[in-house]
Amino acid sequence: MRFPFLRIVVLLLVTCVMSFFSFGQKTNNTWKSLFNGRDLSNWDTWLRATNMTGYSDDEMIGPPQPPIGLNNDPLNVFTVKDGILRISGEIWGAITTKEEYGNYHLRFVTKWGDKKYFPKDTLPRDAGVLFHCTGNFDYAFKCWMRSMEMQIQEGEIGDFFNVGGGVAEFQVKEKVKTIYNETADQYDPSQPLVRHPGRVWRSGNFESPKGEWTTSEMVARHADAVFIVNGFVVNRLFNIFRKDLNEQVTRGKLQFQSESAEHFYKKIEIRPISFVQSRPVLVANQKEYTLSALQNQQIEITNKGEAVEIIAAELIGKEIDSVVIKLPPMPMVLKKGSKIVLPATIKQGTTPGNVVTFRLETVLGPVSDFQINLITK
């Protein structure tokens, strides 16, 4: 049987297996920092022309101007102070890794500033992380490479956008109204896989309040990817394919956008993922929990099988961002015989009678044969 949320990959070469971390064991899960907290010596910068005005390669104020270009930042769009990277957003562009990456787990911590710039000074603050980036720096709107995007936008961190990097498969609920009254297809793992060329809205809003730091993650696994916000899976895509090249897209550089909004990063780090599988057997002390805004429920989960590394949780159903579950620091290794207890409640005003499915995530996808139902009261 095919499970779209977990593609099993067997590596036959032992030398390849040994080059990755095993998520089924307690391993040295060392992260490599991509941002050293001092400068951008590990990055390239690119900025387009100062008088370009929006999502057009031709829309300019006045006569055409050349781009500011590569590793030239006269307006200090990208600056580092006290271990924090500031991206002003004043000119569209990006910082770009010098290396390409594939089969990785990316983690970054960000928060919004106050400043916004034309042409998006009246719109929600916006940025993004582009992955599997290839080609010229100025492919899209004279400022970004061919890529796929994990959107970083107020209230919508974890949206997917296609920036010319190929077409992927998604599970979506069609024509949903977003928080900004737009119409978009929304990630919904209860739906069948379809090939989708454009935007896919995140499943729920798990961001921190403005002014606080949000931890976002991406697992890029071959031609698939998973987006995670503050410990919760919010989007998932499969089989990224470039028709013009007749091949899957599995690796590339990373870009962090400047797109009209001031924002900050205090951590950007990456680690390789492991394809070594374990056989955990996770059992909850109840199959269903009734959640109330008046008191916490305690979700108790015991591992009766092999050790497994958990990187996130996922909620499936309606109003999932009204369910409040306190997760432990991730990633965490759940050993055989050990258990975790997760306090769970709901926000005031949540619609009663909703059934929300809860499951746990590894770098290879959801833990097999484990899910529980949460019923709102």
Predicted segment positions?
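Bacterial Sec-dependent N-terminal signal peptides
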Residues: 1-27
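Carbohydrate-interacting regions of secretory-pathway proteins
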Residues: 25-281, 343, 357, 364-371
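Short strand-edge motifs at loop-to-beta-strand transitions and within beta-strands
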Residues: 214, 297, 338-344
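Beta-sheet-dominated interaction scaffolds and their linkers
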Residues: 276-305
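Short, solvent-exposed loop/turn segments enriched in Ser/Thr/Gly
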Residues: 292-299, 347-357
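Surface-exposed binding patches on compact interaction domains or structured appendages
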Residues: 306-341
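Short beta-strand edge segments in extracellular beta-sheet folds
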Residues: 373-377
